[in-house]
Swiss-Prot record:
<keyword id="KW-0597">Phosphoprotein</keyword>
<dbReference type="GO" id="GO:0005524">
    <property type="term" value="F:ATP binding"/>
</dbReference>
<dbReference type="Pfam" id="PF07714">
    <property type="entry name" value="PK_Tyr_Ser-Thr"/>
</dbReference>
<dbReference type="GO" id="GO:0043231">
    <property type="term" value="C:intracellular membrane-bounded organelle"/>
</dbReference>
<dbReference type="GO" id="GO:0032956">
    <property type="term" value="P:regulation of actin cytoskeleton organization"/>
</dbReference>
<dbReference type="GO" id="GO:0018108">
    <property type="term" value="P:peptidyl-tyrosine phosphorylation"/>
</dbReference>
<feature type="compositionally biased region" description="Basic and acidic residues">
    <location>
        <begin position="11"/>
        <end position="20"/>
    </location>
</feature>
<feature type="active site" description="Proton acceptor">
    <location>
        <position position="381"/>
    </location>
</feature>
<dbReference type="GO" id="GO:0050727">
    <property type="term" value="P:regulation of inflammatory response"/>
</dbReference>
<dbReference type="Pfam" id="PF00017">
    <property type="entry name" value="SH2"/>
</dbReference>
<dbReference type="GO" id="GO:0050764">
    <property type="term" value="P:regulation of phagocytosis"/>
</dbReference>
<dbReference type="GO" id="GO:0005764">
    <property type="term" value="C:lysosome"/>
</dbReference>
<keyword id="KW-0564">Palmitate</keyword>
<keyword id="KW-0391">Immunity</keyword>
<dbReference type="GO" id="GO:0050830">
    <property type="term" value="P:defense response to Gram-positive bacterium"/>
</dbReference>
<dbReference type="GO" id="GO:0071801">
    <property type="term" value="P:regulation of podosome assembly"/>
</dbReference>
<dbReference type="GO" id="GO:0002862">
    <property type="term" value="P:negative regulation of inflammatory response to antigenic stimulus"/>
</dbReference>
Length: 526
């Protein structure tokens, strides 16, 4: 499979303004046939299609790996890691291992998102997507257990179409490490469909309880008990929350890919610096491809930034899969069925979304930006056009960091026709000072876009008029349908002094609990 490059630079998540040398992956830039392209030091001949390893990939050999000299391997005789398939998987690469739901496999090597495994039934070996399996006898094999999901995402999933009264999940507690919470779909005549949460407490002997009068030695027993009757809960437990099969991980070792591996099928839109296409990668994976106009950025600067963008992985950020580094540069990302949030809000479906859903979109974006903030990164071009929407109405942030490497004066100079003046903080317009706090200003404008269903900010005003108005202290007025509390967040985002603007972490906490701030998020013991 060739050598893989891992991010060994502890400075990967870096300070707000970075030195020109960016990225975690050491690449060489070669001149071949007049074209500059990048390859790692272990790549094949420059004349055949080049696949360069993922900069985020790491190898962790399993206890059953044959290489006994590999650091980190367990002593001989250590227990095998046996996993069970949670879903069916049909091999799409020649080194993959197909399996059916319920099949058991022994893990030979844990390497990023693809693990090498051997089927216990067929003895065949190959790579398996790690998010399709779970350790045998672990809670993850239970259909009602949702690992690593937040309280807010539990509510989003339980309230999604297809679930019913009493649909439930058990998840890891966000606040108490090693503890669990039970989330149940309920109905309230005042609020409509709602979700109630119960803390699952632990006994000294390892048992579990919600109410001290009913204790259980396992979570399975607890679930069985509350399926028979509600016994103080809001509802009797009915069926586990519906869950869709997770996205397959991107192909192993395919970071810099040849253009021939992509078939562009449908043009989805055109922006200032190129086009966006729906495409198929290697005849098997649907993706989105952003094609950049030649000359819009330097290949070296783009690749360095892309190597860092690749390490920023979060549910509310669009997944960056791969790049084509010969001009025209291609950026390959996950496909988002509903397109940009701006287009969605203006569509028939989007324009019918009620205010609570608009607040939920805002909370999802704030969550993604809180992650970017925590990683000391900056977006630089946050607006509804750069948020993408999935089929299940999950909002994800796109194009983070891309503005940094654009070399078009029309975009980089404040007088330029493409410079997004109406979204840009005054200190970034006047002094080129882009920080996470200038992103917070842009988020305030994005909130206004959302609550007005995609209306252009500062309607009727030209860019120079906006700059002059801001200097006089003007701020957009509150739209009729906008709650005071939401407008207050916008006004805090638009404070003149960057340090007085809130953090994204704070904004997320307010938006997550916009309708529940006055009541406890967890039910009292029944």
């Amino acid at each position: 499979m060739g050598g893989r490059s891992s991010c060994e630079d502890p400075g990967c998540p870096r300070d707000e303004e970075r030195a020109p040398r960016m990225g975690c992956m050491k690449s060489k830039f070669l001149q071949v046939g007049g074209n500059t392209f990048s390859k790692t030091e272990t790549s094949a001949s420059p004349h055949c299609p080049v696949y360069v390893p993922d900069p985020t990939s790491t190898i962790k050999p399993g206890p059953n790996s044959h290489n006994s000299n590999t650091p980190g391997i367990r002593e001989a005789g250590s227990e095998d890691i046996i996993v069970v398939a949670l879903y069916d998987y049909e091999a799409i690469h020649h080194e993959d291992l197909s399996f059916q739901k319920g099949d058991q496999m022994v893990v030979l090597e844990e390497s990023g998102e693809w693990w090498k495994a051997r089927s216990l039934a067929t003895r065949k070996e190959g790579y398996i997507p790690s998010n399709y399996v779970a350790r045998v006898d672990s809670l993850e094999t239970e259909e009602w257990f949702f690992k690593g999901i937040s309280r807010k995402d539990a509510e989003r999933q339980l309230l999604a179409p297809g679930n019913m009264l009493g649909s439930f999940m058990i998840r890891d507690s966000e606040t108490t490490k090693g503890s669990y919470s039970l989330s149940v779909r309920d109905y309230d005549p005042r609020q409509g469909d709602t979700v109630k949460h119960y803390k699952i407490r632990t006994l000294d002997n390892g048992g579990f309880y919600i109410s001290p009068r009913s204790t259980f030695s396992t979570l399975q027993e607890l679930v069985d008990h509350y399926k028979k009757g509600n016994d103080g809960l809001c509802q009797k437990l009915s069926v586990p929350c519906m869950s869709s099969k997770p996205q397959k991980p991107w192909e192993k070792d395919a970071w810099e890919i040849p253009r021939e591996s992509l078939k562009l099928e449908k043009k989805l839109g055109a922006g200032q610096f190129g086009e966006v296409w729906m495409a198929t990668y290697n005849k098997h994976t649907k993706v989105a491809v952003k094609t950049m106009k030649p000359g819009s950025m330097s290949v070296e600067a783009f690749l360095a930034e892309a190597n860092v963008m690749k390490t920023l992985q979060h549910d509310k950020l669009v997944k960056l899969h791969a790049v084509v580094t010969k001009e025209p540069i291609y950026i390959i990302t996950e496909f988002m069925a509903k397109g940009s949030l701006l287009d969605f809000l203006k569509s028939d479906e989007g324009s019918k979304q009620p205010l609570p859903k608009l607040i939920d979109f805002s909370a999802q974006i704030a969550e993604g930006m809180a992650f970017i903030e925590q990683r000391n990164y900056i977006h630089r071009d946050l607006r509804a056009a750069n948020i993408l929407v999935s089929a299940s109405l999950v909002c994800k942030i796109a194009d983070f960091g891309l503005a940094r490497v654009i070399e078009d004066n029309e975009y980089t100079a404040r007088e330029g026709a493409k410079f997004p003046i109406k979204w840009t903080a005054p200190e970034a317009i006047n002094f080129g000072s882009f920080t996470i706090k200038s992103d917070v200003w842009s988020f305030g404008i994005l909130l206004m876009e959302i609550v007005t269903y995609g209306r252009i900010p500062y309607p009727g005003m030209s860019n120079p008029e906006v700059i002059r108005a801001l200097e006089r202290g003007y701020r957009m007025p509150r739209p009729e349908n906008c709650p005071e509390e939401l407008y207050n967040i916008m006004m805090r985002c638009w404070k003149n002094r960057p340090e007085e603007r809130p953090t994204f972490e704070y904004i997320q906490s307010v938006l997550d609990d916009f309708y529940t701030a006055t009541e406890s998020q967890y039910q009292q013991q029944p």
